[in-house]
């Protein structure tokens, strides 16, 4: 392959730093001895020879070979004394000076005839190395690396000065083998200190640009004069040399020779020295700082910072005049001025190195165009971020712009002083390890001079090296104290960052010479004809930018920060070497590259105002459009995350990024950041193509040529003028152009472009219009000579604009010869040769210029010129000319192909990348049309290059070279091919498809090894899984190479299908890409991951071909099916075949034919049948344990396969929005009937998947409707039906309904055959078989019942069956299933499915639905009732019992939790609606009320039966059970309250269960409901015997329950709730009915029980007395209004006397009964004596009070008689107060109880009730009497005054023996507050 730099990202050599190699440089022999410079005698001769050398130099020949520094003498005696060292040094210096002079004279007289003169870079390689370094640093705004000079004599001389002694440490110098310099040297002057600022990390990228060529003889002369160093210090040349050497004097080079500004310049230089800070001051300040702190910094090797030794700058120590004179005399030079003195360093010792000479050469050399990262290491305490921005000095001259002055470090030298050294407080760096550190950090070698020095210093003892980096202990003394103060102030300001910039002098004149491309070019005059080339003055448009830029940089500097402050030491970095990848290093280099390019571009505008005469010309910096930080970051992200950005340096076209590290880790760009143009972009309006100039040339039409008259170079050119004069004028203009070509600007280049365009019209006019073929031929010959000279000039001057001009000349040469040969109809070989040469030139120069043209074209800026798109236009011209000449659309590609050397068998990755880079970058060229406008990509394919590269890549992979990297590269190749076909629309893809197919076929269709993962299973690509819709063929990050290849196939065939003529091509491609063998994977053979992958990829390839190819070209389904032979095949192979069937059937069902659909279902049935047979065969095989385990494992695997099969069926069913009529084919015997019929053999998970498939299928059929198709009516106008407009609409409706009916009938028949009977069989088996597995079975039953409901709906709508067939007693009826708890719990679910899928069911069977609804409501704690209720409400059922339900939210917002909260309220509302409906029906007619009563009782029976079933089945200890009991009690209470009119315990047997306390717990609210019922009897007429008997029965029932269950308290509470005033406040009204009830209970019932006399009656009486006592006591807790008290007293007065009689009657016989009567009477006392002060009581109340007081007085008298021992009065013997209900009472008492002597026994329950003992009864009796007496005594003691006094007197009389008083008397005394009487006290003091 041609040895050229094709890619912008390919470097010439792998080395870096300052080592460059070139072709011609290697042929020149190196001289044995080196000369110090070129003498004036040989100057002119060297110049001429150098021109000859430059003419022979090809592109890139100026890369010099930089030699290393002279070796340091290793034989150093460190033990010499200072005196001996000084003497030896002087002797060696004298000897070296003599030898040097002799060699110089010999060089002047010797004439070299055999060899041409050595070039400067060959003569002085070190100087030239530093020259490049200095120029490059100045270009980017940095101070070059240098060391101070000026003290070349022995240090001991200064000791003789009259000044104060200065403590100077003698430094040993390494000697140089060269003789001393004879030329004069100027001192290196430092610029003022300026501000340093950190910048963003993203901008710290280094530019690795290469050196520039010596383009002109003047430049060579300037270099020679620079190296020679003339002695004329006051001459113009010396001043200019001074300007060149000093970085701050660049603006003084244009001073006129006639000017007398030499003295002014010298004064200016003197003034500038004031305030300059030498680096030695930094050392002093640092020392002072550490001493002030008093803290010793501990240095660490791992955290060392390169701390170069601080040396002095131009602010030197003041010397005595005698010392100065002696110094100058020893040096042999004249010292004319302290600033401009010329000194020649004299070496003192062979063992010392002359650092002054060596480092002084750095200040003069400014030709190094490469900034080396290593040089920055010499800057002490300077971080890399501080180098990002440069500042300028403040100057009154707006044109003055200075660069930053960096701190300087010296090269460490030996020190032999014997003084005691202080401990080094500074960080230490090992210089010998610096090159390795640079290599590790930046991936490039250090400069050779640093490597040589490191190698030499490695032999110096370590202690000496460390001492060299310590403080020099320099102390400076000054003649004046003011100087000391100034220096101290400068130090303080410098270190604190407050040091102001130095104002420089502006006594010189502004540059007046014109600015040119090189930056320092004077006006050029032609020799014959004066062609005015407009030279731009200094007042350029860039001036404003300079002023703004200088203002921005006038900032204060910041504190110094070390360059390695954020780095680690060499030792630590060596440890990190293993973790840092090459990619990380390349990223660092890339960042530095961006930084350097930005700085060079920024400073290039500054240097346009500097004019040099006789100096090196700085190469032209390309001014590109600055990208914003956002775009730079985006570009970096794309590079780091997706592609590698390959770019050419915008500042130097010779620079190429080295991407070998990227390739070593497998990173390549896919697109090279080249994308298609959008249509409509156009070249500049004045371009040759846009103006139809090229089109007129190709058509040989001079009339349409746009450049028949142009104005260029201040001359007018017109084809109407005399052609011969025009020809002479053109020749003169060309000559002028050649003379001034290096100094061209864009404007002159545009004039040249127009001139060459006119030349094309001139040739066409001369040849075609005038027939002057010889004249055209002569012009071509002249132009060829001009083109050759332009090529030579461009080889010397490597500026970008000159290269563009060279390309412009060569492009128009192709145009000229094309029109000449087309006009003469000659052979076109000359055009082909010229085009080939131009292509070679364009490709050899790199593609960065073309890419820049692409960017300019996309921007479409208004200021875009033809120069900005020149390379693109050149390529486009070549394309159109070659296409016109050869009539081939790929003619340009053939020329490019011939440029490559592709004859060898194998290509390296670098060579392949070169080809790819060219292909990608040339693709947009074909989008430019003859009109200069871009069009859509296409018609630019050329596959031979791609095939050659791909074959090499495949061969490399086959050979196994670096497999990982090669596989990554293969992926990049596939991505690029996909990109070419998809985006660039390359055609004729058959060959590349066949090549890739052969590659994968050889690999058995396996993925690459890097793409195979054992953890990640393979699967079909995503676009294959969705063939029913247009696939996404864009490449994703997860796509493998094979998937990318499949997408390429799909794109290619899809485009071929767009043209009908490509059918044969498609057939050929499809037949060629099909695998030619079937795969047999038996069950016995192992199945590896590669087999799985191979089989999957084979199916995928055939599926893609089937989908992409037309119907007559695609492979058949049987062909795809036969890839795997199903019988006896491996299960995994069947699974792959099944998945392939699934993905393929998605397309076949939608787009395939009926025959293909049948083939597909046959394929599926065969797989399913074999799997079923294998599964069922496992049940009968195997008897041993191992065989059984193997059978279980096989079953599990087969079950998984069946599940996958049914999943595949489910995936084939589309959404309901898509109507597909052929979906019915999925329901077959194998897919449904067989598994439902044998469901007991298969596990539930397999059966469930089958049911889910059926459910999805049935739901799709029920929810999908065929699309509406309007049928145009064919009714004739003569028919009478034509007058009706709705006939057509009716016909359409009928046709649509008929189509729906036919579709449903077809589905119903299929379901009837394969599904419905087997579904019912499975449901019946699961529901009625095993109730223990309810939860296990419910998972299957729910989808089964849903499918059954849908089947029933289809059968009813198809009129095959009626609803009764499924809900009554048909063969598939729900009622025929065994009535199990599981069935009852699922009834509502089944009916919910029926209602959901068919609205007609709820309309025809509303009563059945409501019955089921009440059953669901009975399960109060289950969720299905809520779902069923929500469903009924959603169906908007218009039943009156569902009106006004307590639901406060919308129906669609009802949730289960919300329904549970309103469940009971909803039942209450339903019961109210029933009561209202029944009441309305009863008023209307008896018949309707009877119907409603029977219907409502049926509903309530269903409700209560469900409640009873739930109560009996649930547990009796859980919280759920307790909640259910509470809810059930609430429901029963609501039924009793609201539905008592038509439902009771007689006609509603289920109600008895819940009212029986022995069977169901009664609620606490039962007393309230019972009290309400008791009150209801009061509302009735109690005079009626029926009502009275009902009341007797009700009370007796409650009394019996209380006696049997020991619930006497509940009965008392019942009576109190029914007849008391517990809820009545003071404003309550008198309830007459309740008062009558109380009277009836006391007078008729209680007195009857008391008069009956039996034991049973006595128990009833006790319960009734207790209840009545609580009832009347309840009146004591509220405030009674007077009239209510009056009425109560009237009520009591009726029966109080009778009660007293019975109390007296049973006083002896049954004292318990008497005591209870007295308790009742005590309650009367509280009522009668309350509120007596509110007014005068009535006579009734007074009588009542007196009657009650009499009872208490009698009791007191009885007590007195008891104490005195008197006899009691005779009691009442008989009481006759029986009522008319005595017989009824007797019957009630004897109905359930029979009496014994002391107890009673219940007849049925055998419950025995025993009376308390006699003593207890007596106590109860006395307690009752005492309660009556105490109540009266509390309310009014006046009623008991006489009797109470007597009683107390009797007690007092009984004082002698108080202990003998009865207990009841003591208790009474205690209650009335006289308990003290019974205590042992002195009764003499007691007064009554």
UniProtKB/Swiss-Prot annotation:
Cross-referenced InterPro entries: Mms22
Give the main localization category: nucleus
Q: Where is this region: Disordered?
A: 12-34, 151-258, 316-354
Task: Could you list this entry's UniProt keywords, alphabetically sorted.
Answer: DNA damage, DNA repair, Nucleus
One GO process term, biological-process aspect? double-strand break repair via homologous recombination
Q: Where is this protein localized, as stated in its record?
A: Nucleus
GO cellular component terms listed in the entry, alphabetical order:
Cul8-RING ubiquitin ligase complex; nucleus
Give the Polar residues compositional bias ranges: 13-32, 212-227, 338-348
User: What family is reported?
Assistant: Belongs to the MMS22 family.
Q: What does this protein do?
A: Involved in protection against replication-dependent DNA damage. May act by restoring active replication forks, repairing unusual DNA structures, and/or preventing aberrant DNA rearrangement at arrested replication forks.
**What is the name of the protein in this document?**
Protein mms22
Instruction: Name the source organism.
Output: Schizosaccharomyces pombe (strain 972 / ATCC 24843) (Fission yeast)
């Amino acid at each position: 392959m041609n040895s050229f730099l094709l890619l912008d990202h390919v470097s010439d050599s792998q080395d870096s730093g300052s080592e460059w190699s070139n072709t011609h440089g290697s042929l020149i022999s190196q001289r044995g001895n080196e000369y110090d410079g070129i003498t004036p005698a040989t100057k002119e001769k060297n110049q001429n020879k150098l021109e000859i050398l430059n003419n022979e130099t090809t592109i890139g020949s100026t890369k010099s070979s930089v030699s290393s520094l002279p070796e340091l003498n290793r034989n150093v005696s460190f033990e010499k004394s200072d005196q001996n060292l000084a003497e030896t040094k002087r002797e060696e210096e004298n000897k070296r000076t003599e030898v040097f002079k002799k060699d110089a004279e010999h060089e002047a007289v010797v004439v070299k005839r055999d060899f041409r003169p050595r070039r400067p870079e060959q003569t002085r390689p070190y100087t030239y190395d530093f020259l490049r370094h200095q120029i490059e640093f100045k270009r980017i705004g940095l101070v070059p690396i240098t060391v101070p000079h000026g003290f070349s004599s022995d240090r001991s001389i200064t000791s003789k000065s009259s000044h104060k002694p200065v403590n100077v440490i003698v430094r040993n110098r390494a000697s140089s083998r060269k003789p001393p310099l004879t030329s004069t040297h100027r001192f290196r002057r430092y610029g003022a200190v300026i501000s340093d600022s950190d910048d963003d990390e993203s901008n710290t990228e280094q530019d690795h640009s290469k050196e520039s060529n010596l383009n002109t003889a003047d430049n060579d002369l300037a270099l020679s004069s620079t190296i020679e160093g003339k002695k004329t210090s006051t001459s113009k040349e010396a001043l200019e040399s001074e300007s060149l050497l000093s970085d701050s004097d660049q603006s003084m080079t244009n001073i006129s020779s006639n000017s007398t500004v030499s003295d002014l310049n010298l004064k200016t230089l003197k003034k500038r020295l004031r305030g300059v800070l030498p680096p030695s001051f930094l050392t002093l300040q640092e020392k002072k700082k550490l001493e002030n702190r008093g803290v010793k910094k501990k240095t660490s090797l791992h955290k060392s910072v390169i701390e170069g030794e601080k040396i002095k700058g131009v602010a030197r120590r003041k010397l005595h005049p005698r010392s100065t004179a002696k110094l100058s005399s020893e040096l042999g030079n004249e010292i004319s001025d302290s600033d401009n003195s010329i000194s020649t360093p004299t070496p003192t010792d062979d063992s010392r190195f002359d650092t002054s000479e060596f480092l002084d050469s750095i200040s003069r050399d400014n030709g190094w165009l490469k900034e080396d990262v290593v040089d920055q290491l010499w800057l002490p305490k300077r971080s890399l971020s501080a180098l990002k921005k440069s500042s300028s000095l403040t100057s009154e001259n707006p044109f003055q712009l200075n660069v930053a002055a960096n701190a300087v470090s010296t090269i460490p030298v030996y020190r032999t002083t014997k003084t005691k050294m202080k401990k080094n407080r500074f960080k230490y760096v090992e210089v010998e390890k610096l090159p390795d550190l640079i290599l590790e950090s930046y991936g490039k070698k250090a400069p050779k001079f640093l490597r040589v020095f490191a190698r030499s210093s490695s032999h110096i003892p370590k202690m000496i090296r460390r001492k060299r980096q310590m403080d020099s202990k320099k102390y400076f003394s000054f003649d004046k104290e003011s100087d000391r103060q100034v220096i101290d102030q400068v130090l303080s300001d410098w270190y604190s960052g407050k040091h102001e910039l130095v104002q420089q002098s502006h006594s010189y004149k502004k540059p007046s010479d014109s600015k040119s491309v090189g930056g320092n070019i004077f006006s050029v005059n032609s020799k014959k004809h004066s062609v005015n080339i407009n030279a731009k003055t200094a007042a350029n448009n860039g001036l404003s930018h300079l002023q703004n830029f200088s203002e921005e940089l006038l900032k204060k500097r910041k504190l110094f920060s070390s360059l390695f402050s954020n780095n680690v030491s060499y030792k630590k970095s060596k440890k990190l070497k293993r973790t840092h990848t090459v990619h990380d290093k390349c990223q660092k280099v890339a960042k530095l590259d961006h930084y350097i390019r930005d700085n060079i571009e920024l400073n290039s505008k500054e240097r346009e105002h500097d004019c040099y005469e006789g100096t090196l010309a700085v190469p032209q910096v390309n001014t590109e459009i600055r990208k914003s930080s956002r775009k730079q970051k985006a570009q970096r992200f794309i590079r780091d995350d997706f592609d590698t950005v390959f770019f050419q340096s915008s500042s130097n076209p010779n620079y190429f990024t080295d991407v070998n590290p990227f390739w070593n880790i497998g990173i390549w760009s896919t697109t090279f950041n080249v994308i298609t143009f959008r249509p409509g972009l156009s070249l500049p309006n004045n371009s040759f193509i846009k103006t139809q100039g090229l089109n007129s040339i190709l058509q040989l039409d001079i009339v349409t040529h746009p450049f028949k008259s142009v104005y260029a170079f201040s001359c007018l050119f017109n084809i109407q003028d005399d052609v011969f004069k025009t020809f002479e004028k053109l020749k003169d203009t060309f000559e002028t152009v050649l003379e001034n070509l290096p100094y061209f600007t864009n404007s002159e280049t545009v004039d040249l472009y127009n001139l060459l365009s006119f030349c094309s019209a001139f040739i066409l006019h001369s040849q075609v219009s005038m027939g002057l073929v010889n004249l055209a031929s002569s012009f071509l010959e002249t132009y060829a000579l001009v083109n050759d000279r332009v090529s030579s000039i461009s080889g010397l001057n490597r500026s970008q604009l000159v290269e563009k001009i060279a390309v412009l000349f060569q492009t128009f040469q192709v145009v000229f010869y094309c029109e000449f040969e087309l006009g003469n109809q000659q052979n076109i070989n000359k055009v082909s040769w010229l085009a080939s040469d131009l292509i070679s030139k364009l490709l050899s120069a790199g593609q960065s210029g073309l890419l820049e043209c692409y960017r300019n074209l996309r921007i479409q800026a208004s200021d875009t010129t033809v120069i900005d798109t020149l390379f693109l236009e050149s390529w486009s011209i070549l394309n159109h000319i070659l296409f016109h000449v050869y009539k081939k659309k790929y003619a340009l590609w053939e020329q490019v192909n011939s440029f490559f050397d592709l004859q060898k068998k194998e290509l390296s990755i670098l060579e392949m990348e070169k080809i790819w880079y060219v292909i990608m970058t040339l693709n947009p060229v074909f989008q430019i049309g003859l009109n200069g406008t871009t069009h859509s990509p296409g018609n630019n394919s050329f596959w031979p290059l791609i095939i050659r590269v791909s074959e090499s890549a495949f061969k490399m992979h086959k050979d196994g070279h670096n497999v990982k990297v090669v596989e990554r590269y293969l992926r990049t190749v596939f991505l690029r091919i996909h990109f070419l076909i998809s985006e660039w629309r390359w055609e004729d893809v058959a060959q590349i498809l066949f090549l890739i197919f052969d590659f994968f076929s050889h690999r058995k269709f396996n993925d690459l090894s890097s793409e195979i993962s054992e953890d990640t299973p393979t699967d079909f690509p995503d676009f294959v899984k969705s063939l029913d819709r247009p696939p996404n063929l864009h490449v994703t990050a997860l796509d493998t190479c094979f998937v990318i290849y499949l997408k390429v196939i799909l794109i290619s065939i899809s485009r071929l299908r767009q043209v009908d003529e490509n059918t044969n091509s498609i057939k050929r491609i499809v037949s060629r890409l099909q695998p030619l063998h079937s795969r047999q994977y038996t069950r016995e053979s192992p199945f590896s991951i590669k087999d799985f992958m191979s089989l999957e990829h084979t199916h995928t390839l055939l599926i893609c071909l089937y989908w992409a190819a037309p119907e007559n070209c695609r492979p058949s389904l049987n062909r795809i099916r036969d890839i795997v032979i199903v019988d006896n095949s491996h299960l995994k192979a069947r699974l792959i075949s099944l998945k392939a069937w699934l993905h393929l059937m998605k397309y076949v069902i939608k787009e395939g034919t009926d025959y293909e659909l049948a083939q597909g279902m046959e394929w599926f049935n065969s797989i399913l049948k074999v799997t079923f047979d294998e599964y069922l065969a496992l049940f009968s095989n195997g008897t041993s344990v191992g065989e059984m385990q193997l059978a279980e494992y096989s079953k599990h695997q087969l079950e998984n396969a069946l599940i996958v099969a049914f999943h595949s069926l489910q995936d084939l069913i589309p959404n309901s929005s898509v109507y597909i009529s052929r979906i019915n084919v999925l329901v077959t015997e194998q897919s449904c009937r067989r598994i439902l019929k044998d469901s007991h053999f298969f596990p539930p998970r397999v059966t469930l998947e089958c049911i889910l498939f059926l459910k999805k299928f049935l739901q799709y059929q029920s929810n999908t409707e065929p699309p509406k198709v309007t049928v145009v009516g064919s009714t004739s106008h003569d028919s009478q039906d034509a007058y009706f407009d709705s006939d057509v609409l009716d016909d359409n409706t009928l046709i649509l309904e008929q189509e729906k009916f036919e579709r449903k009938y077809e589905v119903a028949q299929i379901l009837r055959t394969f599904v419905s009977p087997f579904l019912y069989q499975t449901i019946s088996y699961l529901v009625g078989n095993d109730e223990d597995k309810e939860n296990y079975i419910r998972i299957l039953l729910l989808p089964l019942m849903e499918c059954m409901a849908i089947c029933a709906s289809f059968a009813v709508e198809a009129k095959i069956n009626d609803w009764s067939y499924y809900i009554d007693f048909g063969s598939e009826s729900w009622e025929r299933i065994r009535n199990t708890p599981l069935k009852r719990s699922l009834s509502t679910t089944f009916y919910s499915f029926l209602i959901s899928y068919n609205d007609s069911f709820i309309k025809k069977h509303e009563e059945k639905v409501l019955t089921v609804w009440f059953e669901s409501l009975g399960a109060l704690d289950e969720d299905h009732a809520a779902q069923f209720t929500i469903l009924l409400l959603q169906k908007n059922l218009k039943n009156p019992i569902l009106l006004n339900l307590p639901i406060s939210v919308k129906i669609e917002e009802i949730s289960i939790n919300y329904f549970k909260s309103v469940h009971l309220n909803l039942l209450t509302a339903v019961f109210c609606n029933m009561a209202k409906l029944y009441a309305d029906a009863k008023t209307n007619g008896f018949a309707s009320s009877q119907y409603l009563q029977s219907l409502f009782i049926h509903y309530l029976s269903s409700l209560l039966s469900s409640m009873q079933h739930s109560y009996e089945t649930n547990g009796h200890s859980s919280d759920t059970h307790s909640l259910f009991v509470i809810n059930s009690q609430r429901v029963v209470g609501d039924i009793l309250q609201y539905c008592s009119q038509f439902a009771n315990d007689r006609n509603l047997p289920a109600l008895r269960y819940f009212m029986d306390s022995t069977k169901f717990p009664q609620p606490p609210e039962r007393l309230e409901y019972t009290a309400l019922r008791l009150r209801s009897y009061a509302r009735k007429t109690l005079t009626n015997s029926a009502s009275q008997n009902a009341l007797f029965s009700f009370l007796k029932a409650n009394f019996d329950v209380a006696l049997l269950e020991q619930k006497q308290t509940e009965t008392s509470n019942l009576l109190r709730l029914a007849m008391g005033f517990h809820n009545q406040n003071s404003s309550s009204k008198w309830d007459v009915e309740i008062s009558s009830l109380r009277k009836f209970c006391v007078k008729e019932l209680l007195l009857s029980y008391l008069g009956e006399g039996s034991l049973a009656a006595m128990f009833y009486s006790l319960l009734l007395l207790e209840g009545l006592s609580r009832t009347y006591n309840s009146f004591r807790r509220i405030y009674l209004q007077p009239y209510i008290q009056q009425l109560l007293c009237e009520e009591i007065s009726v029966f109080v006397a009778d009660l007293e009689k019975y109390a007296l009657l049973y006083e002896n016989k049954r004292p318990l009964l008497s005591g209870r009567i007295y308790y009742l009477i005590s309650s009367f006392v509280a009522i009668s004596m309350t509120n007596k002060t509110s007014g005068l009581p009535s006579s009734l109340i007074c009588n009542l009070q007196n009657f009650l007081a009499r009872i208490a007085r009698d009791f007191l008298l009885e007590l007195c008689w008891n104490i005195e021992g008197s006899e009691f009065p005779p009691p009442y013997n008989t009481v006759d107060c029986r009522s008319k209900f005595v017989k009824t009472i007797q019957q009630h008492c004897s109905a359930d109880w029979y009496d014994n002597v002391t107890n009673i026994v219940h007849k049925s329950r055998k419950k025995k009730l025993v009376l308390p003992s006699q003593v207890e009864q007596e106590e109860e009796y006395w307690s009752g009497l005492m309660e009556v007496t105490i109540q009266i005594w509390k309310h009014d003691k006046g009623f008991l005054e006489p009797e109470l006094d007597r009683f107390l007197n009797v007690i007092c009389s009984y004082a002698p023996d108080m202990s003998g008083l009865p207990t009841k008397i003591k208790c009474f005394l205690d209650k009335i507050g006289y308990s003290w009487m019974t205590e042992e006290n002195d009764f003499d003091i007691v007064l009554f």
